[in-house]
Regions:
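Short loop/edge segments at beta-strand edges and connector loops
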Residues: 107-108, 150-153, 253-256
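Dinucleotide-binding Rossmann-like beta1-alpha1 core, especially the glycine-rich loop
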Residues: 42-114, 122-123, 218-220
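Flavin-dependent oxidoreductases
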Residues: 46, 63, 172-241, 245-252
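Glycine-rich FAD pyrophosphate-binding loop
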Residues: 19-38
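C-terminal catalytic lobe of FAD-dependent flavoproteins
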Residues: 248-307
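Beta1/beta-strand and adjacent pyrophosphate-binding region of the FAD-binding site
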Residues: 1-10
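Conserved Rossmann-like nucleotide-cofactor binding loop
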Residues: 10, 33, 183
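Helical element adjacent to the flavin cofactor pocket in flavoenzyme catalytic cores
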Residues: 126-161, 165-167, 171-175, 179
């Protein structure tokens, strides 16, 4: 038996991939599935990254999202809105070019055409036509329905695969994968990462359906599926900037999100770390949702490799 600690995108994707390979994976979750780093409805998929290897992985992940759409039968999981990186974009353009990914440069007017409710301050940007808004609830619900999930607190995980639960149960696993977000360092050991929080607000007042997803120096934004609403997040909330960017929008909700900081993340905050001790694998990262299908494959490969 393989025990997976954490029912976010990483744990559920790994469990699904392992089950398709004939392995029994038991997912242990202390709360509700997809409730911490995977919380909320709004996630951006993008090919655009600052490292060509991440652009290539995103191209592979896009194929995986389309495959999941076919396998789950839950409707569209990856939207076709496109993605705009605004502001200083030379590093992103260079990485996409090296990866062979399609993109085109935009001027201020072209950015405004994709985001008609934004008072555009950026003179340049790039458009990633393969980017879009992920339908997170559909995807994670479909993964959870296909997983064996047990609600429990994990107290400790030993090198030999012994897992101690809060109710006194002791599990013996051939392999253990810990991908429990903020809880991972406490269960696995130091992974050179710090977790914090930021708030993502939801807005209405203009129909954002079909608008491109956005990453800019001021924050990130995306349409929430077909609801017509727009989500926008910042590392540090700056209401004045938001009012200037979106003068016709009104906040109607918020989601408190987990953010990560680590020296091994790139300048865009993307990346992950994977470590092993004995039979136990520890995994942490940031901006992981878009890579979901690829992470499932990567984590399954790593867990099953005894080397």
């Amino acid at each position: 038996m393989i025990v997976i600690v954490g029912a976010g995108i990483s744990g559920l994707a790994a469990a699904y991939t392992l089950s398709r390979r004939g392995e029994h994976a038991l997912v242990i979750e202390r709360g509700e599935p997809f409730a911490e780093q995977s919380v909320g409805l709004a996630r951006i998929f993008r090919i655009a990254h600052q490292r060509p290897e991440l652009c290539r992985l995103a191209l592979h992940a896009r194929e995986g999202w389309r495959r999941w759409e076919s396998e789950f039968g839950a409707g569209r999981l990856l939207g076709s809105e496109g993605f705009i990186s605004a502001g200083a974009v030379d590093a992103v353009a260079a990485a996409m070019r090296e990866a062979g990914a399609e993109f085109r440069r935009l001027d201020r007017g072209e950015i405004a055409a994709h985001l008609p409710f934004v008072d555009v301050p950026w003179e340049t940007g790039i458009f990633d036509p393969l980017g879009g808004s992920l339908r997170i609830r559909r995807a994670l619900t479909a993964l959870a329905q296909r997983a064996d999930i047990r609600r429990a607190d994990v107290l400790s995980v030993a090198d030999d695969g012994a897992v101690a639960l809060g109710d006194g149960t002791q599990l013996r696993a051939e392999r253990v994968l810990i991908c429990a977000g903020v809880q991972t360092p406490a269960l696995f050991g130091p992974l050179d990462i710090e977790f914090g929080s930021h708030t993502r607000f939801t807005y209405q007042g203009a129909d954002a359906t079909g608008a491109a997803c956005l990453s800019a120096p001021e924050g990130y934004g995306l349409p929430i599926g077909s609801t017509g609403r727009w989500a926008f997040g910042q590392d540090v909330a700056d209401p004045a900037t938001v009012r200037r960017l979106f003068p016709t929008l009104t906040p109607v909700g918020q989601v408190d999100c987990v953010t990560a900081r680590a020296p091994w993340l790139d300048a865009g905050g993307d990346g992950w770390a994977l470590r092993r001790r004995g039979r136990v694998t520890g995994f942490v990262g940031a901006n992981l949702m878009k890579f979901g299908p690829v992470l499932g494959e990567l984590l399954a490969d790593f867990v099953l490799d005894a080397g």
